[in-house]
Amino acid sequence: MSSLIVKSLGSIVSIIARIFFFRRSRPVSNPRTTAHISYFRMSRKRPLSLQTVELKVRMCCTGCVRIVRNAISKLRGVDSVEVDKELGRVRVVGYVDRNKVLKAVRRAGKRAEFSPYPEPPLYFTSTQNYFVDPSKEFKESYNYYRHGYNGTEQHGNIPVGSRGDDRVSNMFNDDNVNACRLM
């Protein structure tokens, strides 16, 4: 009997406390305004600065492009999404955290990593990059959980040397009229 009285008094006290202490004011003047909705959905944290996030995502068809674009555009704070299927690059601009963008793409079922090279090089700059098989680029040493890079030791821009207008590969080509002929 006493436990029933204690439970009923506790519920009455919680209802009274909820009514008087946790009541939020809503604008009553115009019922069509949405100011009260945005007030309750405001983020409590400080907003992030505008960032450009570049990802390297394995995409094979237009369906993959659509899946990646939809997964990223659902994030709060994304301004624009640029997807390049041929290069396998995704550029996201907005007030977002780069790790959240990476996790959103991975949740969509795509293998993704941060792109260490912001712009594609004009041509191959080393033999290591020239003889790379693109099918083995996403291999078993994929560092999925640690930091988002695919285990390469090169991060950042590669210095590109200039070779001039004529390429070395065309110097001994038979199709080139001005080529060097050695017999």
Swiss-Prot record:
**According to the UniProt entry, where is the signal peptide?**
none
- InterPro entries linked: HMA_dom (IPR006121), HMA_dom_sf (IPR036163)
Keyword Lipoprotein tagged: yes
* Residues annotated for a metal cation binding in this entry: 61, 64
The record lists its disulfide bonds as none
Indicate yes or no for the key word Transmembrane helix.
Answer: no
- Pfam families with a match to the protein in the record: HMA
List the Gene Ontology MF annotations in alphabetical order.
metal ion binding
Q: Which residues form the propeptide?
A: 181-183
Cysteine methyl ester PTM positions read: 180
PANTHER family per record: COPPER TRANSPORT PROTEIN ATOX1-RELATED, HEAVY METAL-ASSOCIATED ISOPRENYLATED PLANT PROTEIN 44
Explain the purpose of this protein: Heavy-metal-binding protein.
Protein name in UniProt: Heavy metal-associated isoprenylated plant protein 44
The top of its lineage is: Eukaryota, Viridiplantae, Streptophyta, Embryophyta, Tracheophyta
The gene it comes from is HIPP44
